[in-house]
């Protein structure tokens, strides 16, 4: 995929690669293979934020995730669940916090 972009960011001093994506279920499967490799290869944590639900002509699959600098998965949100991932780069830990919508 796009490791050159991440490498350029790291070479310019980035200590975290933050990726905002709009991926389908297929794209998330590919991202879950690619981004841990980016983390391992470049030695920096990766935080991937995906959209959830209808987006233009497709359905965003959710599945936002964070990996440490060795490519270990630290946290991920389940599929189409809205939420936020809190990544602590100092302690190499993360937590996925689901968000629930208020009932109408």
Question: What are these regions, as identified by a protein language model?
Answer:
Residues 1-42, 48:
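Active-site beta-loop-alpha substructure in enzyme catalytic cores
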Residues 37-38, 51-104:
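C-terminal beta-strand edge segments of enzyme domains
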């Amino acid at each position: 995929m796009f490791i050159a972009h991440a490498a350029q960011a790291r070479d310019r001093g980035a200590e975290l690669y933050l990726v905002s994506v709009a991926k389908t279920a297929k794209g998330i499967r590919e991202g879950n293979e690619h981004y841990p490799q980016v983390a391992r290869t470049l030695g920096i944590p990766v935080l991937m934020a995906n959209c959830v639900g209808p987006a233009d002509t497709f359905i965003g699959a959710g599945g936002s995730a964070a990996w440490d600098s060795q490519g270990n998965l630290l946290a991920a949100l389940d599929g189409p669940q809205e939420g936020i991932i809190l990544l602590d780069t100092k302690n190499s830990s993360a937590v996925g916090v689901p968000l629930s919508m208020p009932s109408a």
